[in-house]
């Protein structure tokens, strides 16, 4: 599960974060493998900007599920600080922490510069900073003058996240697991996965390539209900295109009538990797997707306005994956 801590127009930020906790607790109980949270900034509808802080909150309320960043936008941060933050999390919750890294700012250009004045230079140094972060977390860093405490010597899985050929190239070259952001930028997914597998350079930690596809999933008792619930997600993406990033709105009927032709095309392209329907429909659609992509793991994000409906969608999606895995 990837959670963006999406703020709805009837909910405070505090309540939103506690709803994220509720979702994580349910995923933990149902047997989901991971619960990741994403770093975004200066977005009124997303409350997950302090990602490491939230991960500690979520980890403290769950027992088994892996907790991770999906992802930390590394150019926004010092690699040493990230090593210390995630080293702290791993020390508190051993064997449960994932560290996903992205190259984008998770915001607009002006905000990126406010976060870190040399962001664009750091973005170009992303491969170098990934290596530096790996070094800080390695037990072999003990001979260097700059060391991460906590962090050094801890086995924290590091993932490369992305939505382009650049990210797949880096993940393949470094022999790292790779997660693709198909939930908002699916255009290059198939090419990126193929390149990653064909050019994978085995590492000691990861002798074989490993892929995650993150997709949108909205499930309900009927496909008609699921499509209605999904209208809030469509409006969210429409607002992004219009540069009007307000909190998520309640679902509406005929949501596509709110868009002009170009807006509809853009939204449908961004959301083309979405699975919306009842249990049977999503089982068939998602199974075909897995067979085609040969992806190792599916991660879902579920943008639904009503909290109870979102939790129920999470329950249905667990049954969907159980059905697929049983085939």
Regions found by a protein language model. Name each.
Residues 1, 35-37, 67-69, 97-101, ...:
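Hydrophobic faces of well-ordered beta-strands that scaffold small-molecule active sites
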Residues 3-18, 72-79, 152-162, 270-279:
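Active-site mouth loops of central-metabolism enzymes
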Residues 119-147, 188-294, 325-326:
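An alpha-helical appendage that flanks or caps ligand/catalytic pockets
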């Amino acid at each position: 599960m990837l959670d963006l801590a999406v703020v709805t127009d009837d909910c405070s930020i505090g309540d939103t974060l506690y709803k994220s906790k509720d979702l994580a607790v349910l995923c933990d109980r149902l047997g989901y493998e991971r619960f990741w949270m994403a770093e975004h900034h200066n977005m009124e509808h997303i409350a997950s900007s302090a990602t490491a802080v939230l991960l500690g909150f979520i980890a403290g309320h769950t027992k088994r599920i892996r907790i991770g960043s999906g992802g930390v936008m590394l150019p926004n941060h010092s690699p040493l600080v990230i090593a210390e933050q995630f080293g702290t999390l791993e020390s508190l919750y051993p064997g449960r922490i994932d560290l996903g890294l992205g190259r984008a700012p998770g915001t607009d250009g002006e905000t990126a510069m406010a976060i870190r004045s040399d962001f664009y230079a750091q973005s170009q140094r992303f491969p170098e900073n990934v290596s530096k972060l790996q070094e800080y977390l390695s037990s072999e860093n003990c001979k260097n003058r700059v060391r991460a405490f906590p962090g050094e010597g801890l086995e924290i899985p590091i993932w490369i996240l992305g939505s382009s050929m650049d990210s797949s190239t880096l993940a393949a070259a470094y022999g790292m697991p790779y997660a693709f952001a198909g939930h908002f930028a699916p255009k290059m997914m198939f090419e990126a996965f193929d390149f990653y597998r064909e050019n994978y350079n085995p590492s000691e930690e990861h002798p074989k390539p490993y892929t995650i596809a993150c997709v949108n999933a909205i499930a309900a008792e009927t496909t008609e209900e699921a499509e209605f619930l999904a209208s809030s997600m469509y409006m969210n993406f429409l607002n992004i295109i219009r540069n009007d990033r307000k909190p998520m709105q309640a679902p509406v009927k005929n949501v596509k009538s709110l868009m002009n032709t170009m807006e509809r095309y853009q939204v449908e392209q961004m959301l083309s990797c979405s699975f919306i329907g009842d249990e049977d429909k999503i089982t068939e659609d998602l199974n075909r997707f897995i067979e085609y992509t040969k992806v190792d793991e599916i991660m879902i994000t579920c943008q639904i306005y009503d909290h109870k409906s979102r939790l129920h969608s999470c329950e249905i999606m667990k049954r969907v994956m159980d059905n697929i895995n049983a085939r």
